[in-house]
Amino acid sequence: MSRVANSPVQLPSGVELKQNGQDVTVKGGKGQLAIQIHDSVELKIEENVVTFAARDGAKASRAMAGTMRALVNNMVTGVSQGFEKKLVLNGVGYRAKAAGSTLNLTLGFSHPIDYDLPEGVTAETPTQTEILLKSANKQLLGQVASEVRAFRPPEPYKGKGVRYADEFVRRKEAKKK
C-alpha cells in the first residue's frame, strides 16, 4: 500500500490554511479553495506543516488519508503557483480565440463553438492553434481541458483534432487496395 499520507504538506509563505471541523480552506495569491476532509482522516496543523493520519487502522482509512493529503497538497500548489494545461489544434481551418470568459472554437463543424469557461479557469491563445488553460483548481482545470478536447478528439488516421500538448496520438495506416 502507498504511504502518501506519511509525508507532511509544507505550506509556502503567503499560503494560509484554516480548519473548521472537517472543512479546510486554503488561501493564497492565486485564489481560495475549500474541501471537506473525510470523517476517517485526522488533520493536524503545526506552524507551516500539515500532517494527515487515519483515525483508526483500517485499510480504507489509511487509503483515504493518502487521498486527502494529495488533494490538500494540490490545493496548496494551486493557490501558490497555479496549474496550466496546453491544448493543440491540428487540422485545416481549426482555430481558437479566447474572449473574456468564453473560448471561441472553429473545429470544422458547420457552426463555431462558444465554450463558456467556469469561474476560476482562464484561457489564453498564444497562437490560433494553441490554447493555454490556467487555474488554481487542478480538478476543474482537467475537467475543462477534457471537455474542450471532447469537441473534436484526435483521430488516428491524420491526427486532426484537439489534443493535449504532451499527448501522443497513435497513428493508423490507411487501408491498402
From Swiss-Prot:
Record's subunit section: Part of the 50S ribosomal subunit.
An annotated Gene Ontology molecular function: rRNA binding
GO cellular component, one term: cytosolic large ribosomal subunit
Organism, scientific name: Teredinibacter turnerae (strain ATCC 39867 / T7901)
Gene3D superfamilies (alphabetical): Ribosomal protein L6, alpha-beta domain
Entries under SUPFAM superfamilies matching the protein: Ribosomal protein L6
NCBIfam families referenced in this protein's UniProt entry, alphabetically: L6_bact
Source taxon at top rank: Bacteria
Main function: This protein binds to the 23S rRNA, and is important in its secondary structure. It is located near the subunit interface in the base of the L7/L12 stalk, and near the tRNA binding site of the peptidyltransferase center.
Similarity section: Belongs to the universal ribosomal protein uL6 family.
Protein name (Swiss-Prot/TrEMBL): Large ribosomal subunit protein uL6
Classification via InterPro entries: Ribosomal_uL6-like, Ribosomal_uL6-like_a/b-dom_sf, Ribosomal_uL6_a/b-dom, Ribosomal_uL6_bac-type, Ribosomal_uL6_CS
GO biological process: cytoplasmic translation
Keyword terms of this UniProt record: Ribonucleoprotein, Ribosomal protein, RNA-binding, rRNA-binding
Leader peptide range in chain numbering: none
PROSITE patterns the record matches: RIBOSOMAL_L6_1 (PS00525)
